[in-house]
C-alpha cells in the first residue's frame, strides 16, 4: 500500500494542474501563494473528418503532455516530489469525458465542440418548445454549450460509445482521476453541463430522462477543496509525483480564477480579459435571468452562484488587429524591447475619449438564449488620416470591449438587483494601463488590478491547500493571498462621453444583426442550433 505523505511531514509546496483550451500547465506554488515554477505544453484538439464542428479531446496524448508538464515543473523548481503537499486540477468548462464500466476513459470533447447543432434544435422542440427554459431555470445553462445535446449526438451517431458509457465527468475531474483512480465531479465545473441543480448543487437526473437519455452515468459530486484520493503508484511512475500525495477536488477555470482574485463575497465583480472576456458577479443565492441573457454557474464557494456574461473573441480581435495592421509597430516594439500592445496603447492614449465616433462591431452583449453576433466591421470611419488611423482604431477597440462589458454588467444588475460598486480586472487585458482606465471610465466603477493577473492556477492551489488543512477555508485564503498592483478611478467627464457612445453603439449593433438575419452578412459566431 502506498505510503501517505502529508504537508506537516514534508510538503512545503502545492501543485495546480490547469487544463486550458489551448494548453496544459503544471504550476507549483509555495505556501505564501508565490508561483515557484511552471511546466507548460500546447495541445491541439481533433476535428473528426465528416463531422462538422467536432473538436475531440485526445485523451492518450494529452495525458502524456500533462505528465510532461508535471515533470518539467518539478525539475524547474528543483524540489523532490515529497515536497508537494497536495495536487488539484482545474480546466476549461463544458468539456466532457466518458468512461466505460471498467473506469477507462473512452471519449472526450473540448469545450469548443459544436457537432451537436441538429440535436440542439431537436431538443429545443421538446415539451412544447419549453425544454431549454426548464434546463435554464434549473441549471442556469442553455443548450448551446450543454452536455445534453452532445450525449444525444453520441446516441444518434456513436451508439457504440453511448451504450458503453458508465460515467461522465469534466476534464479537470479526468486529470484528477488519472492521478488518483477516483471519479467525482465538482459543482463549479459540472454546473456547465446543464445537468446540475443550482439550488442543491447536485445532479438533476430528470433532465436527462426528459431528453430520452440515460440518467445512470452521472458521477458522485464533491465540493472543491475536499479530498478526492491519493496519487496512485501507476500515476507516480508516469509523472514522477510521490505515491500517496493527496489529490484534492478542483473546479472550473473561471470560478477558481475568481477565488485566486479574492472575488469570494456576494456582489463582488470581476472582468476577466482573455481570448474571451467574462463579466462575473457573485450572487448570494441561486437566481436565474427571466430573459435568459446570461448564464448562471455554481461558485466554488458553497451556496453562492456567479452570473457570467461573455464577450466573444475580445482578445483575439486585438491580436488580429495587431497582426493584420501593425507590422511596423511590432518591429519598433521589438527593437525597443517592449510589447507591441504597450506601444499601441501609447499611441492610442493621444486619441480623445470616444475615438472620433468610430464604432467597432465585433462581439455583441450576451444573449444566451439566442446567441449570435453581427459581422465584424468598423462603422463611422472617416477619410481624415489625422483622426482615422491605427491609433484611433486601436483605442476604439479597447473602448468597445469596455462598453460591451458595461452592457453585460447592466443586464446582470437588471434581473439580480446586485449592483457592483467596484470591479477586479484580471487576465491579459489588464496588463494594459490605458485599457484598465478606459474600463473604469466606461463603467463608472473603480477598477482594481491584481499583481497575479492569471489567477486560475493560484485558485486551484488554494483548493489543494484547503484540502489538506494548510488553510482554513477557500474564501478566507483567497482574500488573504491576493495582492494589488494598481487602482483606476473613473473620470466623470469621460464617463459622460462613453454613456453617449454606448447608446449609439447599441442602436447600430442591432442594425448590423439585422443584416445577418437577412443573410446579407456573416455572423462573427453563432451558437449551435441557430
Curated annotation (Swiss-Prot):
Q: What is this protein called?
A: Autoinducer-2 kinase
Q: Name one GO cellular component term.
A: cytoplasm
Write out the entry's keywords from A to Z.
Answer: Cytoplasm, Kinase, Transferase
Q: Which GO terms describe its biological process?
A: carbohydrate metabolic process; quorum sensing
Q: Which family does it belong to?
A: Belongs to the FGGY kinase family.
Question: Which coarse location class describes where this protein primarily resides?
Answer: cytoplasm
Under the heading Pfam families, the entry gives: FGGY_C (PF02782), FGGY_N (PF00370)
Known catalytic reactions: (S)-4,5-dihydroxypentane-2,3-dione + ATP = (2S)-2-hydroxy-3,4-dioxopentyl phosphate + ADP + H(+)
The record, for InterPro entries, names:
AI-2_kinase (IPR033676), ATPase_NBD (IPR043129), Carb_kinase_FGGY (IPR000577), FGGY_C (IPR018485), FGGY_Carb_Kinase (IPR050406), FGGY_N (IPR018484)
Provide the GO MF annotations for this entry.
Answer: autoinducer-2 kinase activity
Q: Where is the signal peptide?
A: none
Q: Which of the seven top EC classes does this enzyme belong to?
A: transferase
Q: Main role?
A: Catalyzes the phosphorylation of autoinducer-2 (AI-2) to phospho-AI-2, which subsequently inactivates the transcriptional regulator LsrR and leads to the transcription of the lsr operon. Phosphorylates the ring-open form of (S)-4,5-dihydroxypentane-2,3-dione (DPD), which is the precursor to all AI-2 signaling molecules, at the C5 position.
High-level lineage: Bacteria, Pseudomonadati, Pseudomonadota, Gammaproteobacteria, Enterobacterales
Subcellular localization = Cytoplasm
Write the Enzyme Commission number(s) for this entry.
Answer: 2.7.1.189
